[in-house]
Amino acid sequence: IHCLIRTYVEAGDEVLILAPFWPLIRGIVQAFRGVPVEVPFYDRIFDLEEALAALEERISERTVALYVSTPSNPTGRVLPGDWLEAFAEFARRRDLWLLSDEVYEDYVYRGEHVSLAPLAPERTVAVHSFSKAYGMAGNRVGYLAAPREWAAQARKIATHTFYGAPTPGQWAALRALEGGAAWIAESREAYREVGAQAAALLGQEAPAGSTFLFLDVSAQLGARGLEGFLADCFEDGVLVAPGASSGQDYGDWVRLCYTALPPEKALEAVRRLARRCGRDVPPVAAES
């Protein structure tokens, strides 16, 4: 994503970012003197016409791209094909690039993943990741699919930024491609189950995809605000990410990753968080 932003975004260029978003995208745009324009979306807009109106409201003559994440990090929302077709048409009409973050494409539990790339191949850059698909975050291997000329420019940026992905990681990625389908299928079912259980404990709808839950904890915030809430969670042995890192409108929210630990340990952390949020969650009975 660093390479794709550096390839096309110049100083002063604006990028529409559907929020809440992956925490690093805003900073990447800013790193190259671009202007991230947040569009509060995934948690509140469920009508397509309203979505298009929100984009029109925030676009300007400096806007060059629209960043879309589906399945969404951090909400777990999966956008349907007709919404993506409408976004593609919006991008054509407004002459924008589409930056399509699809790193959780293999982890859809309800509905189906639809890629933006086939809908607007001439103006879409799709980002994919072995880190998420195959549990290989430490290997730092991913790829993008883009129009040929655009990809050639991104390759130049990559060469002069990190030169190339580490060879051991590339070999591991090749092995994953050759024999990782069963692992993905098994992991998807495990993630689906733990995500649904975590959501139920927190009184939330089960996520449609990704590996996150995004929670409004405003009712639990006292005089110390979110910082105090995070400190209390830490004392409980639970780490969650502050929602403000995913958008300016989300200062009273937190992001939970329910796959950061084995399922039973993750669910115990969720139980502690649920109790911190005022939910009546009894402890798990000890085995006799």
Residue ranges of predicted features:
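Conserved glycine-rich beta-strand-loop-beta hairpin in the small C-terminal domain of fold type I
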Residues: 170, 174, 190-199, 204-218, ...
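PLP-dependent enzyme catalytic core of the Aspartate aminotransferase-like
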Residues: 53-57, 223-224, 235-241, 246-288
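Conserved core segment of the aminotransferase class I/II
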Residues: 122-192, 277
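Hydrophobic residues in well-ordered beta-strands that form the structural core
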Residues: 17, 38, 67, 98-100, ...
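Helix C-cap/helix->beta junction micro-motif
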Residues: 32, 93-94, 236
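Phosphate-binding glycine-rich loop
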Residues: 1-14
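A short helix-loop-beta submotif of the ANL/AMP-binding
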Residues: 31-37
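Active-site phosphate-binding strand-loop segment of PLP-dependent enzymes
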Residues: 42-110
